[in-house]
Amino acid sequence: MLYEVKEISGGFSLITAQTDKFKSESLNIHFLIPLSKAPYSEVLLPNVMTQGCAKYPTRRLLRKRLDYLFSSSVSAYLPTFGDHMSLCFSSSFLKNAFAYDSCDIAGGTAELLFDLMLDPLISNGAFSDEYTEREKKNKCDALRAAINNKDSYASNRCLRLMCEGEPVSFLYSTDTEPYEMITPSSLYDSYLDIMAHAPIIMTYVGENICFAEELAYKLSERLKNEHRNVYKSTVTYKAPKEIRYFEEKHNIKQARLVIGFRDKPSTPDDIYIKTVFDELYGQSPVSKLFTNVREKLSLCYYCSSGRNHETGNMIVRTGIKAENKDLAYNEILHQLDLVKQGDFTDGELENAKRGFANQVLSVLDSPDSIASFIFKGMMRGCILSPNEEAEKIMRVTKEQVADAARGVKPDTVFFMYGDETEDENED
C-alpha cells in the first residue's frame, strides 16, 4: 500500500492510500475547527446538512440516488482530535469495475458528496427552519438525558472538572442554552465561515489516485480560497499542583469512582510506548487494573483506563460499592506505582504489545479504517503503515514503559454515590 501527501493549496492537503485490495473505496473531506471557538453551531451541521441538499431536498430523494449508485453511502460526522474537531463529509462506494451497467459509481458518489457539502438546502440565506429546530431539540434532549447513563456521565463529569477553562472542556459540556440560541441563519453563517477558512484534509483509499487528485483540485476551485487557516495544536501540558476531589449524590446503588490523570501530549516518537503502557495498566482484559483491582481483590465491578493522546489526559473509571472507595482508589494508584517501578513480568509486557499490535494491524481490514488511520497520522505529523507501527510497538522495552508510567500524574477525582438501599434508576 502506497501513501502520499499532496498539498493542493494553502491549508488544503490530500492524503491517498493506493490499494487494489478492496471492492470498495473511501473518500473523506475534513474541515478542521478549533474547540477554542466553542463551536456549538458546528455540532448541528452534520445532521442538518444530511437531511437534504438543493438538488435532493429530502432524505427519500437522497436514498433513491444512493440506491442508483449501487448502495453507496454518504454521511457527515464530527470526530475530534486534541483541541480540534473535524466536520467530516464521508463517502464509501463500490469500484466502477463492479458496476454491471457501466455506471460511474465513484464519480456519482463524489458528486453527491459535493452536493451535500457545497450546495446545502438553503432558503433566504438560512438553513431549513424545520431541520434546524429538529436537530436543536434532538441535541438538547440528548444533553439532558446524558445523566441517565451513569458510566459516561461520571467519566465526562470528571474530565469537565479537570479541564475547566481549557478548549477541550467543550467536549464534556452539558449546557443546552448555547444550542437553544442557534437560528437557521446563524447556523448558515457558521457553515460559510467553515467553507471559507477551515483547514482541509481530504483522504482517499482506493486504486485511482488521479481521480482523487482531480476531485481535490475541483473542490479547491469551488471554494476559491488559496490561503486557508493552517492547523496548529495549542494543547499545552498543565502539570497538576494538587489532587482535587469532587463528589455528587445521585439516585444510584452502584457508586462510580473516576480518577483523572495528566501527562504530556503524545508525540510520534512516544505514542507507541504510551499505548503499550495503557494496554498493560488498564486498557485490556489482562491489564494490571482488571487483573488485580477487579479479579484478585474484588474491589470493583469494572475497572479500566482510557487516554486521549493528543491532550495527554487519561482517566481510570470504576463501578464500586461506596464503602470500597478508598480501598479502590489506593489500589489503582498502587498498581500505577508498580508499573513505574518496572514491577511487571515479561509475559505481561508481551501480552500488552501483541494486543496493541493486533489492533493496529486490524486497520488493514477495511478502506474506512485505513482512512481514519492516515487522517490521524497526518494530524500527528507522521504517517507510517500499520505494519511499520506494529514493528515499533513490538520493539518497546520494559524500561520505556516504566518511564512512560512515571509521566502520569493524578489530577482530579470524581466520586458519584447514592443511597444503596434505593432502587437504582439508570441504564
Feature roles, as predicted:
Residues 119-123, 228-231, 344-347:
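Flexible helix-coil linker/hinge segments at domain or subdomain boundaries
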Residues 15, 23-35, 40-41, 60-115, ...:
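M16 family metallopeptidases and their MPP-like homologs
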